[in-house]
Every structure is written in structure tokens, then in C-alpha cells.
Design a protein with these regions (language model features):
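Bacterial N-terminal signal peptides that target proteins for export
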Residues: 1-9
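Bacterial N-terminal signal peptides
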Residues: 8-17
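Enriched - but not universal
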Residues: 9, 147, 239-243, 292
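Structural boundary/hinge residues at secondary-structure and domain interfaces
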Residues: 20-146, 185-231, 247-293
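Broad, structure-driven detector of short, well-ordered beta-strand segments within folded domains
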Residues: 99, 151-156, 227-245
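A short, solvent-exposed beta-edge/loop patch
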Residues: 144-178
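Extended, charge-rich low-complexity interaction segments
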Residues: 166-174, 220-238
Length: 293
């Protein structure tokens, strides 16, 4: 388990240290029925955080030291090399990085573009030697391996890391390989939701519908809602922008169901904007506050 965590940690570090790349078709691997899709602009996030400048040198040093306690031998040398030069990972993170969740949260995945297939393979071979992932296998035009409770696959353009809420990684193999060879016509990229995701401003942008909620919770949500309502009809676009000292979050409803729109309008008519009359009673050091009227 601890070995698997270091595999995920290395990917996370590379995300914030990434370098330039060009467009590709890797987003075709997002399933058309994805319940939640998030896009991450790690290039802008890294620029705003200052991690690539002089101020980020201490952070990089701490990340390198942290890896020393979790990786050894060739895996550590590879990780250290990637931190110094992220392109050595073979992955590109100035193209958008995506995370998606399937309906009822049955599976979740991280998707990135591959710049150099050979370097990705070398990275995973180093992790395999540390028993962080299993033997690499070639099948259906890609290479795949198991990393803890997740499966990882890559080819010359796509890197896909996929896990299940049931913890049975191998049960995802069929879906993983199918998504790796999926074309645009059968992908999320051909939906109007993807167009809104791609055009929205923000370092982290999410399009989601309520079908991502597990089955055992959805029954409670349906109370008081139209009988013919589909959870897929309840959709939101959420964008987060990182500014100095704050994170600005914008939420937009993408609901098209007329009955549901009427219900929301009725609820909105019974509420009003918060005037802030009670703010003076909050302590000056309040970390989070919320209110409704």
C-alpha cells in the first residue's frame, strides 16, 4: 500500500513541475457517459505558485527529500531526474490534464498526454523494480500495469490511470483497454458539455451531473422531484481560478429539463440575497462561514 502511494505521489509532483507540449487526441479516452469531468491547467497553476522560479527552489528541495524516504535505487534516481526536468517523465501537463468519474462513482481516472512513450515506460519500469507496480504487459495497442488498487495504461499519445471504488483493479481491465482505443465519435469530446468545459476560464474546471452519486444515496435525492427526472439532467459547470490570497469559484447550472427549471425557480422565489447583517457577530479569526436566507 505504501509503495502504491509513492507512485501516485510522483505523478502529483510531476503535475506541478511540467513543461510544454502540443495538442493531441488523448482526450478521446474520456467516456461519453462520464458523470464528472475535471480539467486541470497545471502550467498556469505552476506559474502562479512560483514553484518554477527562485521562490520555488525550497519547495522542490523538500519534495525531493520526501521522496528519499519512499523510493530507493533506480526509482529514486528516476524521480530525482524528473523533478529537475519534468519532460523526463514522458508526460505533458501543459495540455490539460483530466480526471473523470463514471456514473454512480463506479470508477475514477486520471488522463494525461504522452510526449515520449519510451520515457513513460522507463519510469514505470523503475517503479516496477521497487514493487510499486506490476510487470508491464502489452495488449490492444498499449502497455498496461497494475499500481496498487488502480490500473495504468499508456501508448504513444495517451496515459490513463484508472481505479475502482470497489478496490478490484483487474475488473477494470476491459474498460481501460477499450477507452485507450476509443475514437472521438464515441467519446466525451463530441458532447456539448465538453465544449463548455474547454471554453470555460479557470485553472480547474468541472462539468458534472448528479449521476456520479452512488446508488444508495440517490433515492433520498429523488424525494420531491419530478418522477421522470434523470440525474443526468442535473448538471453544473464549476470553474476555480487561483488569485493572490484567494480562490474564486464560479458555478453555473446547465439544467435543460423544464420541470426541474420550474422547481428551481419556485425555490429561488422563496429566498433572497444575504445582506450580511450578522457578520459583525462572527469572530475576526473565522476560517469559514456560510449563510442562507
Amino acid at each position: 500500500m505504501r509503495k502504491g502511494i509513492w507512485g501516485f505521489a510522483l505523478v502529483a509532483i510531476v503535475l506541478l513541475m511540467a513543461s510544454c507540449s502540443s495538442e493531441s487526441e488523448y482526450a478521446n479516452a474520456i467516456p461519453k457517459d462520464a458523470a464528472m469531468v475535471m480539467s486541470f491547467d497545471f502550467k498556469t497553476m505552476a506559474e502562479k505558485s512560483g514553484i518554477n522560479g527562485k521562490g520555488g527552489e525550497k519547495v522542490v528541495a523538500k519534495l525531493t527529500d520526501a521522496l528519499k524516504s519512499g523510493l530507493e535505487g533506480e526509482a529514486y534516481k528516476t524521480a530525482e531526474k524528473i523533478i529537475q526536468n519534468p519532460s523526463e517523465s514522458g508526460l505533458s501537463f501543459t495540455d490539460k490534464v483530466y480526471m473523470f468519474i463514471t456514473p454512480h462513482s463506479n470508477a475514477f481516472a486520471l488522463l494525461a498526454k504522452v510526449d515520449d512513450e519510451g520515457k513513460v515506460e522507463a519510469l514505470l519500469e523503475a517503479l516496477k523494480n521497487e514493487q510499486i507496480c506490476t510487470e508491464l504487459k502489452s495488449e490492444s495497442g498499449c502497455t498496461w500495469t497494475q499500481m496498487g488498487t488502480a490500473l495504468c495504461a499508456f501508448n504513444k499519445g495517451t496515459f490513463l490511470l484508472m481505479g475502482s471504488n470497489k478496490g478490484d483493479a483487474l475488473s477494470l481491465k476491459g474498460s481501460l483497454l477499450s477507452l485507450m482505443r476509443q475514437d472521438a465519435e464515441n467519446s466525451y469530446v463530441k458532447t456539448t458539455d465538453f465544449g463548455k468545459l474547454a471554453s470555460a476560464k479557470g485553472e480547474v474546471v468541472t462539468v458534472m451531473n448528479m449521476s456520479f452519486i452512488p446508488n444508495d444515496i440517490t433515492m433520498q435525492m429523488r424525494m420531491g422531484m419530478p418522477a421522470d427526472l434523470k440525474l443526468e439532467d442535473i448538471k453544473y459547470l464549476v470553474s476555480a481560478t487561483f488569485e493572490k490570497g484567494k480562490i474564486v469559484v464560479d458555478v453555473e447550472t446547465l439544467i435543460e429539463n423544464k420541470d426541474l427549471i420550474a422547481m428551481y425557480e419556485k425555490q429561488s422565489a422563496a429566498s433572497s440575497c444575504i445582506k450580511g447583517a450578522c457578520l459583525e457577530y462572527f469572530p475576526a479569526n473565522t476560517l469559514v462561514w456560510a449563510g442562507g436566507n
